Amino acid sequence: MNFFLKILPIVLLFQISFPQVNTESMRDFDQKNKLASKANFDFGYEKSNDEIFDILFTFRSDYYKPKNLHSFFILSYQNGFKSKLNEKNTIMNKGFGHFRITKQIFSNLGVETFSQIGFNDFISIKERKLFGSGIRTAIKEEMNFKSFFGAGFMKEFEEYDDIVSSTKILNRFTSYMTVNVNMGQDLSFSNITYYQPAISRIYDYRVLVFNEIKFKINHFSNINITINYRFDNEPHENSGKSYFEINNGFEIIF
């Protein structure tokens, strides 16, 4: 706790946020409770072709049946404005709902199924829907170090709100690698990397990288800093290939 008090003023200087929420980063590694919920409040900044300053709220609820079943539901909403020199600020919105179930098959192997619906004004996605399934396996599980790998397939529907409205339907392979490290009683670090290529178009792929540092205040609250990066090799219309987001906010556990 002394370490946290020393570093707290530095953390509060970085009140900037990373709006792309990634469901794997919000997964609770402590599965003792059968029912648990958490809420995140973040303030942030993201940069691609434009700069956006925003505020983000995320709610998550998990249900655990130890050594058998894990399900969770996430709701996320983000409101911000796009700032350009000598131009009127533009209001931007982003949000999604995500549901996932993981069924344990063996001690270190589970089967997952998931679905999601959302929208993203920042990259002109009017509506995005997807569903899929896959496997999740533990690579290493120790008290202060945990690593997981997941892989599967998903069907993705995207409707774009560009000058000319268009729709894209793709089947994608999705995989991710998760690393979670406890660096002390009040400090932890996690990294999640996704790779999502289209099955029919090998050059249409996305790479998502999420990094988070979490400072524990007490059993019911944390301060989080995240630095995330997204690369889309074949973005639609005039969207940039890459953008990054920086996030600093508070997490309440109940």
Each predicted region: which residue ranges?
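Cleavable N-terminal export/targeting peptides
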Residues: M1-N33
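Repeated loop/turn-to-beta-strand initiation elements of outer-membrane beta-barrel proteins
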Residues: K67-F73, N108-V111, M143-S147, M183-F189, ...
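Outer-membrane pore/translocation modules
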Residues: F73-R172
